[in-house]
Amino acid sequence: MRKRPQQQRAKVIVDTILEATQICIAEYGLMQVTTPKIAEKSGVSVGSIYQYFENKDQIILELLRRKSENLGLALKQMAMVKEQIELKALIDMSLQFGFDVMREDNGFFIEVLKYWHGYNNSEAAEILEKHFLEVGLYVFNRFYPHWSFETLKNKSFVIINS
């Protein structure tokens, strides 16, 4: 971001820009999103958008960063709240969670996944990898406590990156 918002009003403007960007991606597709379309959907002028973001790609990267953080936290919460659940049920729930996320927000994540190769080195990808690794370590440690930490870490890494 060009300028991190400090005041509440500025934070609301940035949130509005990001919400409009998400809607535009779901509505027009990732490659057809433009700053003028974001401005129109958000009700924020193009000039005001450029006070906070250098370009459309920076807006999208910030949106993906935030969505990835929220997705990772939701997955962690789901995995850690269900302490008494069996492994198979947890796997089923995790898969259903993934499908549900894909359907949310008018297919926003489906559209992003089509072009994920362009974002796989982004901060958003790093955030997701960190959360998935932590969930993997938690689950493996819970169901396979006899495995060493290195084994857990390596198996989690292989599964996450497969």
Language-model regions: role of each:
Residues 2-6, 53, 80-84, 118-122:
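A short, mixed-charge helix-start or loop-turn motif at secondary-structure junctions
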Residues 1-12, 146-147:
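N-terminal intrinsically disordered/low-complexity leader segments
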